[in-house]
Amino acid sequence: MNDTVFLPSRRFGGIARLYGDEALARFSRAHVCVVGVGGVGSWAVEALARTGIGRLTLIDLDNVAESNVNRQLHALTDDFGKAKVTALRERIAQINPQCEVEEIEDFVTEDNLETLFRRPFDFVIDAIDQVRIKAAMAAYFVQHNQPFILSGGAGGQKNPALIQTADLSRVTHDPLLANLRYTLRKRYGFSRDTKEKMRVPCVFSTENITLPQSGEACSTDTAPQGLSCAGYGASMLVTASFGLYCAQAAVEHIAGRK
């Protein structure tokens, strides 16, 4: 863990006034991992950096593309073709030069999951759309008491006011998370009792998905990692809000630690 402690200053004074000096010190020492830094994850990273989180590990193998412009923070003309984790590291350096950023240009797989998460993080945000890998991560995190939150699908939605957080057992309206719930119960032995929490916190929306005006929606288990929303239409009004909900969960968890 990074031992640097930020004292309240012009840069993060507003955070100290809101959360308190002790919480700001905890933020500066915290290490948060974001898996998938696309339409949801990139905005989560921005929020964490602007809240004074002292160390960030970013995991993604994708590059910034022109088709990302409608929903991803780092999708700027000058950054097309650049690794997403690199584009974000460069941006974070302008926000908080003291923030340590580790770039991992890779996708999480069932083979490398244990290696990537062997070290404990203060919090992990999952913002990928591959069900099999989301399930493997969720099962691993629950087993190892790793604090985390999963993002549901953010494509095909227009109203950020309908976003909420809940345990996976309580999630509705989200095909990605419904598939995840089924997979965890079938492959990893999670309880099928609908009254019992699964200990898998999620961000999701109760909005009914709007199907594409043309083309076909992508399969959530065959698309590249990162909540690409490539098949559904997508707006940053929603994808960014999902990311901010994820970041809020991380910040509140870290602020509440003693």
For every predicted segment, state its role.
Residues 2-6, 119-123, 128-133, 143, ...:
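Glycine-rich phosphate/adenylate-binding loop
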Residues 40:
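Hydrophobic/small residue at the entry helix of a nucleotide-binding pocket
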